[in-house]
Amino acid sequence: MILAVKTRERTELIDVTSEISQLVQKSGIDQGLCMVYVPHTTAAVTINESADPSVKSDMLMVLNQIVPWEANYRHLEGNSQAHVKSTLVGPSQLIAIEKGRLVLGTWQGIFFCEFDGPRNRKLHVRIMEEHFVQ
């Protein structure tokens, strides 16, 4: 399954937990795994606190401190920092499914991380059922 994600800012975190949870519920799978993958070199996916929006701001602030917009980058397309940030955050997450629901902590959410927007992006979701061997 592919989720379309339309980003509006150059750098932003978008909570996609609800959309992914709906896909898991529609799958009818009781127990298994949900893999979320970003097929872009300037975007990523992460799991972090979703209750307090200031956490998203803090994450972006720290990433901008670690990887500044302007530096002596050799890649001349103007988005080198986006490539580095996406590498640090990572392109995928694997979440357990139990009783038909994603296993996330009380405050956890799944975030699409845009580092070179705005753009139309894709988020691949694979839902795999667990089979027990006897």
What are these regions (language model features)?
Residues 1-134:
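Active-site histidine-anchored catalytic micro-motif
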